[in-house]
Amino acid sequence: MMSTYKRATLDEEDLVDSLSEGEVYPNGLQVNFRNFRSSQRCWATRTQVEKRLIVLVALLAAGLVACLTALGIQYRTRTPPVCLSEACVSVTSSILNSMNPTVDPCQDFFSYACGGWIKANPVPDGHSRWGAFSNLWEHNQAIIKHLLENSTASVSEAERKAQVYYRACMNETRIEELRAKPLMELIEKLGGWNITGPWAKDNFQDTLQVVTAHYRTSPFFSVYVSADSKNSNRNVIHVDQSGLGLPSRDYYLNKTENEKVLNGYLNYMVQLGKLLGGGDENAIRAQMQQILDFETALANITIPQEKRRDEELIYHKVTAAELQTLAPAINWLPFLNTIFYPVEINESEPIVVYDKEYLEQVSTLINTTDKCLLNNYMIWNLVRKTSSFLDQRFQDADEKFMEVMYGTKKTCLPRWKFCVSDTENNLGFGLGPMFVKATFAEDSKNIASEIILEIKKAFEESLSTLKWMDEDTRKSAKEKADAIYNMIGYPNFIMDPKELDKVFNDYTAVPDLYFENAMRFFNFSWRVTAEQLRKAPNRDQWSMTPPMVNAYYSPTKNEIVFPAGILPAPFYTRSSPKALNFGGIGVVVGHELTHAFDDQGREYDKDGNLRPWWKNSSVEAFKQQTECMVEQYSNYSVNGEPVNGRHTLGENIADNGGLKAAYRAYQNWVKKNGAEETLPTLGLTNNQLFFLGFAQVWCSVRTPESSHEGLITDPHSPSRFRVIGSLSNSKEFSEHFQCPPGSPMNPRHKCEVW
């Protein structure tokens, strides 16, 4: 239908172009006029009949011309034909059900686009938030469940290990039989815990090494291997701040506002201490309060995330010897050689540290804290991470705390959902081939690649029109955009059984021993991390597994990654109008692409190296442009609590830039392919549909507790403001919805970076 409509339009234009001399009306009718003066005849010589006929003919002619003109204008400006296919009717129904058309789109587009969806979708039991991402993840979970529970002879060893892990998790009978025994034995093996029994008093360094490497906890600080930001072809050890049990330092420091959470956290700590064999509850509570006070001391020296956005300022490369001087409470060479064994670490080993002041202060804190408390704190980190692998009593304790922390209503979620999530989280690449074969069409990579190419072209077109950027920086920015590498669906190695098995060769899953399997995985994953230290970074090493409903940009690799899990509806559907696909996956692509040029990504060059490649004039101009967004988003609030416009700046830049690039790409597509059919009954143009599709991707609901947590931890703005903030900055949105200047969705002062 679309191509037929396009050909019809061209045919009509060809007809007009082929006409001969004379005035041409929009319908192609030619009317020739002879010279009036040379052919006129005196009115007085006409008979009455002639005069009456002439007047009548003149009136008829005038009426005919008026009718033809009106018909011509209507014909010329008619809307595209309506799509009445089953797919179009279905997507129209979904859109209508999500909308609240009684809301003025120029007043509150989020409520206009999502009001119906929000009314029909209260936060489900067992969840603290719900939206399009959640719905798609539930769909993916059901697929993974089926795949894990139905063995086939063709699966690889890695896939079989994922199935064994999942089935051990599902064996609740065995888990209930073991109760707390697996963790209690582990604590005893580590030298004990004063909360539940005697402990080894001179074991600080050994305990720290074991809980860091074998069990992937991060008390005091985190240690990991990643590409060196200033030499992206080389991996290097990183040391950074860490160690809080709650999601943000704000929970500890704003005690009045977060009193309910702090009390709930302490009660949770006490409950776990009791379940693990602690005796007197008052004694347990007293020691757990000391741990909480120690975490509060850590929170006091922890740097807020909004002050860590400029990596040029916080990046410091030191040697192991210099690190020893910086933070002497840890014997760094023995520590590093133990956790990275068999890799040898000497005093000249380069180490990247962020927030040198934090490491200095945490070293002082360790040296001035009682050894019993330090051990209690380290073991608490282990308990907090591993208790979910134990029996139902621990699950109940988790749920009770989650209700306080996130407002999650207590519910008996099916066990399989927990087990699918944990298996995917730990062995997602192992089960990846099953998921890809079941869900990912062969041509999906090509389709996604075409969309990325169109978005990238549109972004570069916008780049060429920026007035605040100098020409040299613009040229380098275009080179960086051209160099961005696309990773779609899955890393190639997972589809080769031999390569996949090689990756998981050193991991063994044991039937019916869930806790043991989880502990083995933590140890295995650290060994994989340690092995990367002397290897070059690898593009095939993804930070997200194939089923994940998400996407990301890697600055050191200068690549954008789109797992298979995010490519279905509502982000992309083959049968949907292009307006919806560009508003869905198109904006997602544009968002990740723009991250290469947000306040953090812009500091990396086309090769993924952190260096000052912008001219100072453009750096200053960029900062001025971004301050507008900081102020804009800081004026938004949820339940009276403001959005942190500084902390969310990078994501806000990406949201705005992604929307702009996707809209421009859609316009380019229409110019090339012709107008699409419209959807029935909506009364919307396809340009309006593009913006509506974008907004409905972000329809979501959250509990008040979850909203509070998001405001102080999430670098993304709340969904409502991801929609309102981006659209109110879009001139094209205001034009298509005819929003009056000065209305909420069309403010006179708009922010724009890219």
Curated annotation (Swiss-Prot):
Membrane-crossing segments per the record: 53-73
Keyword list, A-Z: Cell membrane, Disulfide bond, Glycoprotein, Hydrolase, Membrane, Metal-binding, Metalloprotease, Phosphoprotein, Protease, Signal-anchor, Transmembrane, Transmembrane helix, Zinc
Cofactors named for this entry: Zn(2+)
EC number: 3.4.24.71
Keyword match Signal: no
Ranges of the Cytoplasmic topological domain: 1-52
Reaction(s) the record says it catalyses: Hydrolysis of the 21-Trp-|-Val-22 bond in big endothelin to form endothelin 1
Residue sites binding Zn(2+) per the record: 591, 595, 651
Assembly notes: Homodimer; disulfide-linked. Interacts with PPP1R16B. Interacts with TSPAN8; this interaction recruits the endothelin converting enzyme ECE1 to tetraspanin-enriched microdomains and positively modulates its enzymatic activity.
Family (UniProt): Belongs to the peptidase M13 family.
Name this protein carries in UniProt: Endothelin-converting enzyme 1
